[in-house]
Design a protein with these regions (language model features):
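Phosphate-handling DNA/RNA-contact segment within nucleic-acid enzymes
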Residues: 82-190
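Short, small/acidic-rich helices and loops at N termini and domain boundaries
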Residues: 1-8, 75-78, 241-254
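Short clusters of hydrophobic/aromatic residues that line enzyme substrate/ligand-binding pockets
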Residues: 73, 143, 239
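A broad structural signal for alpha-helix termini and local helix breaks/kinks
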Residues: 6, 64-65, 169, 221
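Non-catalytic accessory segments of DNA primases and related replication-initiation nucleases
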Residues: 1-63, 225
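Short, basic/aromatic recognition patches
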Residues: 66-89
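TOPRIM fold recognition
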Residues: 150-151, 159, 163-256
Length: 256
C-alpha cells in the first residue's frame, strides 16, 4: 500500500527532524550541535509554520502564491547571515528541507527575506543550500509540500516555480532546488502520471535537465504511464513568471 509507504517515510522524517507535522506542541528542544548536520537539524527544529508568520505569508503572496506550503517549508525570524566567518546581520528566512527516497533529510535550503521579497545583500546570495549528506554525496531528493501520495505528481526546480505550477494546474508538485537535482529525480512508485515543469533557461540548463529526466523515467520507471512536459514560451522565465504575468506555456505528452 503506497499510502502506508508514505506514512513510513513520514516517521523517518519525524524521527530525524524531531517534530510531528501539524503539531508543534510535541516538538523537542534542539540538542547540543556537534556537527554542521546537527546545527542544520536544530535550526529546522527552531522554525515555525509559515501560517504563523505575516512576513512569510507576504513573501509568497507577492509571488501570487496563496496556498502556503506546509510540511517541509517553514519560517525562522531574524536568522543570522554569515559570509564565511563574518556576521553580516540578521534577516527573516524561509527554510525548507529536501528529503531523499527514504525520507531522510538531504539538503536544507534557506531564503533570506525582507519587506516581502528576497533580502538585498549586495553581492552576497539571498539563498543558501546546505548538504546534509556525508562525503559530499548528492542524493536524489525533493521538497515535499504536503503529506500525500498522488497518482498525478509534478516536479519543478525552484520552490516558487513548483508552488506556482501547483497554483496554476492544481496538481501536487515537488521542488528539486536546481537543474542538476531535477535531472536525477525519480518519481515514487505510486505515481502514474508525471508532470515535468521546466525553467526556460537562456543557457538551456532547465530544458536539458527536463529532457534527461523524461528519458530516464521512460526507460527506468515502468510504473509511470504518462509524462507531461511543460515550460514557459518566454526565454529566461519559470512558472512563477507564468503565474504572475500570464505567459504562454509549451506542452508535450509522452504516453507509454
Amino acid at each position: 500500500n503506497m499510502l502506508n509507504a508514505v506514512g513510513a517515510e513520514l516517521k523517518d522524517i519525524n524521527r530525524e527532524i524531531g517534530f510531528k507535522y501539524g503539531d508543534d506542541r510535541d516538538k523537542p528542544q534542539p540538542a547540543r550541535a556537534r556537527t554542521t548536520h546537527d546545527k542544520l537539524i536544530n535550526l529546522f527544529k527552531s522554525s515555525i509554520p509559515l501560517r504563523e508568520s505575516e512576513h512569510a505569508r507576504e513573501y509568497f503572496q507577492n509571488r501570487g502564491i496563496y496556498g502556503l506550503p506546509g510540511y517541509m517549508v517553514r519560517f525562522i525570524p531574524q536568522l543570522e547571515y554569515w559570509n564565511k566567518k563574518e556576521l553580516i546581520g540578521k534577516r527573516d528566512a524561509i527554510i525548507s528541507c529536501a528529503t531523499n527516497a527514504l525520507g531522510r533529510p538531504a539538503y536544507m535550503h534557506i531564503t533570506y527575506i525582507e519587506d516581502g521579497k528576497k533580502a538585498d545583500l549586495g553581492d552576497m546570495p539571498s539563498r543558501k543550500m546546505h548538504s546534509l549528506s556525508p562525503n559530499g554525496v548528492r542524493p536524489r531528493c525533493s521538497i515535499k509540500f504536503a503529506n500525500q501520495a498522488p497518482e498525478i505528481l509534478a516536479v519543478a526546480e525552484g520552490m516558487e516555480s513548483a508552488l506556482s505550477y501547483q497554483e496554476i494546474y492544481k496538481t501536487p508538485t515537488e521542488a528539486t532546488l536546481n537543474a542538476g537535482l531535477l535531472e536525477e529525480y525519480r518519481p515514487p512508485e505510486y505515481v502514474k502520471e508525471l508532470h515535468i515543469a521546466y525553467d526556460n533557461d537562456k543557457k538551456w540548463a532547465g530544458q536539458s535537465a527536463a529532457n534527461k529526466l523524461k528519458h530516464a523515467v521512460a526507460c527506468r520507471c515502468p510504473w509511470v504511464q504518462k509524462i507531461v512536459m511543460r515550460g514557459s514560451l518566454e526565454t529566461g522565465t519559470d512558472f512563477n513568471d507564468v503565474l504572475l504575468d500570464g505567459l504562454g506555456v509549451e506542452t508535450s505528452d509522452w504516453i507509454r
